Amino acid sequence: MLACLMAACATTPPSGSGSATNGSARNAKIAVVAAENFWGSIAAQLGGERVTVRSIIRSPDADPHDYEPTAADARAVAVAQYVVENGAGYDPWVAKLVAANPAPARSVLNVGKLVGVKEGGNPHLWYSPHDVRQVIEQISADYKRIDPADSTYFDQQKQNYETQGLARYVQLIADIKSTYSGTPIGASESIVTPLAEDLLLKVATPESFLDAISEGTDPTTADKITADEQIKTKQVKIFIFNSQNSTPDVAALVTEAKNAGIPVATVTETLVPATASFQDWQVGQLEGIKQALSKATTP
């Protein structure tokens, strides 16, 4: 019951009794805007030829936290039937953009609300395989509500994505869980935490250090010393860092890890390359983590 309530409040449905069949009535594709390209990739693959998807954040150099929407972004949202925002305080500019461009037949999916993460929680929801599965379910359900005439098509798209598109992603997660569960790791910021939790890896780096780097503030001296000592004394087996947010403190830890012979794996905030699919991007990173763990635990 709780999951149903969360799903219901996460998507703001369109008002008006006839809006659910609006897309099929015009025999037009559903116009979708995703705040970030990782959600946009999933939305595009679930919708196939029945949707058009525009991702606002699609450059590796853009910072979703403080992005300034353009006139083109506003125009895209103005005509969108469906908007996907991360929520949880990650992209507050989306709500402002939607409010400034009202449309009675538009639905908005707030991923944070869907999975129960409020502002102040860890907003890196796309790094949680569990949350990703919930998003897939919700987007597919929303497509069928917006365009019920194509429900069978959307069901098939979802099945293909889950059984084929995500097959390697799911397998790598299972492999890492079964082989390296409980392994202590170091990390540069909280973007790593949701994935590590699902992989059953133990993040040893102080949580306050991870949060500081993610939020763009300076870690405390005590946290810096702790993170450094964990590497020097090899309390962590590998170190994972976000290469799109490499501060001097993070760079120092990466160098320290390499000097100590601790394998280093890399993740990024958004799709790299920008044209990659969600699953190809994640698979590449998971393979890097798996290789680092293998190297660290091989005598």
Feature map (PLM): residue ranges:
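C-terminal motif of bacterial Sec signal peptides marking the signal peptidase cleavage site
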Residues: 4-8
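Extracytoplasmic metal-acquisition and chelation regions
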Residues: 9-299
